[in-house]
Amino acid sequence: MKEPRIFPRERPTPWTRAPLPPRGRLDGGPGVNAGHPMGVNTDPFLMAAGSLGGNLAPFARNPAPFPTPSGSLASNPAHFPAGARDPSMTSFPRGMNPTGTGAASFPRPGGLLGPGPGPGLNPRTGALPGSGPMSNPRLGGLPGPGPMANPRAGGLLGASPDPRSGGPMGPGCGPNMRAGVLSSGTGPPNPRPMGLGPGPSPNLRSSFLGTNPAPRPGMFPGPGLGPNPRACGLGPGLGPNPRAGGLGPGPNLDNRAGGLLGTGSGLNLRMAGPQGLDLAPILRAAGLLGTNSVSFSQASGNMGTNPPTMTRVPGPIGPNTGPSSRGIGLSGPNPSAMSRAPGPMGPNSAHFSRPGGPMGVNAGVFPRGTGSGGLNPAAFSQSSGTLSSNPGTFQRSAGLQGSNQAVFPRASGPLGPNPANFPRATGLQGPSPAAFPRSAGPLGPGQVAFPRSAAGHLGSSPAGPVGINPAPFARPTGTLGLNPASFPRMNGPVGKTLVPFPRVGSLPGSNPAAFPRPGGPMAAMYPNGMLPP
């Protein structure tokens, strides 16, 4: 029995010169468009919008699982023209070169991530990466912006040079097409298609992570303040000034509306990126990572630290409400005290010298509220950073890794040895009732026994999904810009040392305050304060 062939072998439109698809194309396999649970796609080669977007490749894609639903992200505005059912036989407007990139006008329904590359006559929602050179309405695609003025909505990541509404992550740029997703760049206003790179267009755009000053119908994130309607992906909109993207720092000021992760209402030279520093005061509107209600000079990147003060408003990871000299990045410590408002990782209401980043160190103690990363109903001096810990007594409430009911009083010095034993609450690896006395180590004698909570990603961690170590421990100085103060060892793949105390010594052994233990997800304490190899 032959596979069901929905279309006759003859081409309904003589002007399409594309070859017929091979007969065996649909044999067997899911490709057959027969009674698929998701619905049958009328065209076997229709690049239906899939979860990842339309397929741009010349090979047929199985449309069955992806019926053409009308939807914000995956809608098929039109069926293929009869001749365009095979990708190779894309229907081109007369005179267009079939081999031209994006020349084919497939009325392909846009995939989740992107607009179809073919900008042909047929309006099509976006396909994955390609931008269509022709002006056809299409939904934004993943990375590639269409150079032409096509009204298209932003795809997940892609930006369209044309005025289009932003997708979840895709910026819609007005005349300027720029989809700086993660990194930002400063550039001329010329439309430039970019995937992850920064788009230099002057349009302000709001983004998932970045904010867009331009008013635009952004899907997710922030309001557009600028004259240019532009939706932005992860990267911040440059506005009049080209600005740094999500990952990269941008030297110029720009207005940004708050994006999911991005800051938006105030000017900021740079938004803190994972690796970028913010050098100028930034007003951050509420974002995924937190809003900054006060201008702060720098936000630290993942690895970088920012010396100037900044305040943050609550975000999933924890807002900073008080001025602090630096916002911590992944590894960078902040020397200045800043208070943080609640976030998923837990609100910080008190000043602490450094806001903890995922791996940042918190120098000060502050009460921490419940957070997704390990709920602490009782105030305890642990910074809200993912891995950072603050010295001080706190009760630890149940977290992903197990609950610690015991209060851990901490004594003596910023990270000084704590004489009190900490019973370990039951964790994934089981309760550890015994306290661990620690004697002198690189950092000096530490008498503290501390409970170990259930294992984190890399090992036992007192609390938090990533394993927040409540116990103070020295921060290693090193590539990540951790505290130069003495520390027995860096824990974790990146060396998570979350010592929440102000650094004193510049050398690893120079810190006068001996703190008994280096804390970390992997930290198994030995009497001498050393960590296991």
Curated annotation (Swiss-Prot):
Annotated spans, Disordered: 1-37, 67-251, 319-347, 370-434
UniProt main location, coarse: nucleus
Biased composition (Pro residues): 214-226
Subcellular location(s) of the protein: Nucleus
Keyword Cell cycle: no
Cellular component, GO annotation: nucleus
Keywords: Methylation, Nucleus, Phosphoprotein
Asymmetric dimethylarginine modified-residue sites: R368
Bias-annotated ranges (Polar residues): 379-406
Modified residues (Omega-N-methylarginine): R396
Entry superkingdom: Eukaryota
Biased composition (Basic and acidic residues): 1-12
Keyword Ubl conjugation appears in the UniProt entry: no
Modification type Phosphoserine: residues: S160, S432
Similarity field: Belongs to the DERPC family.
Protein role: Potential tumor suppressor.
PANTHER family in the cross-refs: CTF8, CHROMOSOME TRANSMISSION FIDELITY FACTOR 8 HOMOLOG (S. CEREVISIAE), DECREASED EXPRESSION IN RENAL AND PROSTATE CANCER PROTEIN
Name used for this protein in its record: Decreased expression in renal and prostate cancer protein
Organism: Rattus norvegicus
Organism ancestry: Eukaryota, Metazoa, Chordata, Craniata, Vertebrata
